[in-house]
């Protein structure tokens, strides 16, 4: 049985407000949320994404996060393609993969790796646009938003060009799944 509902109050309030997913920064809270969802205290359709800030990057950690209730997992951002592929082989939930990073936390850009990320790791959510702001969690301006959209377009263009077999879900479609 999970600890008292006090930790969950913001989660239940958010769901009633229309929010259907949370980024979770703590493994213990992830377990509490999973248990609350299983007991019906949170709706079954409430999704939990594990944050890259948790710092996981190995298959054993990913399996644990999946078992703790993560519906998708963000690995640490600087893993090689073979390392990412090893994570995919371990879990069935979608991976959230960063294709770029703010200058304040590494500043890498992996646009040309995006097609291979999709090929090796699908189902994935490609996360892009972070390199357009100076640091993580900083407020974005309208200009940053335009740059982020441009960066997302470039990533999509690379995937379409170098891995045209990739299937992109349309807005409103079901979540990505491992193919049978």
Which residues make up each language-model segment?
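Glycine-rich, proline-tolerant flexible connector loops at the mouths of alpha/beta enzymes
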Residues: 1, 19-21, 174
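Short, contiguous clusters of charged residues that form electrostatic/catalytic patches at enzyme active sites
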Residues: 28-31, 150
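Catalytic alpha/beta core domains of metabolic enzymes, predominantly
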Residues: 38-164
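Phosphate- and divalent-cation-binding pockets in alpha/beta enzyme and binding domains
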Residues: 31-33, 83
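Single conserved hydrophobic/aromatic residue that forms the stacking wall/gate
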Residues: 2-13
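Polar low-complexity intrinsically disordered regions
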Residues: 165-180
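Non-catalytic positions within long, well-ordered alpha-helices that form the structural scaffold/packing
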Residues: 15-16, 66
């Amino acid at each position: 049985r999970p600890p008292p509902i006090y930790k969950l109050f913001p989660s239940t309030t958010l769901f009633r407000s229309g929010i259907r997913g949370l980024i979770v920064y703590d493994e213990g809270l992830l377990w509490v949320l999973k248990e609350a969802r299983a007991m019906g205290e949170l709706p079954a359709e409430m999704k939990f994404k594990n944050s890259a800030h948790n710092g996981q990057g190995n298959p054993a950690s990913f399996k644990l996060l999946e078992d703790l209730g993560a519906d998708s997992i963000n690995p640490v951002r600087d893993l090689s393609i073979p390392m990412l592929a090893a994570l995919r082989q371990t879990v069935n939930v979608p991976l959230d993969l960063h294709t770029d990073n703010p200058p304040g936390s590494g500043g890498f850009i992996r646009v040309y790796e995006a097609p291979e990320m999709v090929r090796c790791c699908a189902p994935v959510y490609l996360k892009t646009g972070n390199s357009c702001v100076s640091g993580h969690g900083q407020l974005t301006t309208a200009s940053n938003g335009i740059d982020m959209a441009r960066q997302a377009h470039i990533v999509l263009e690379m995937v379409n060009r170098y891995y045209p077999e990739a299937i992109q879900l349309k807005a409103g479609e079901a979540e990505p799944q491992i193919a049978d």
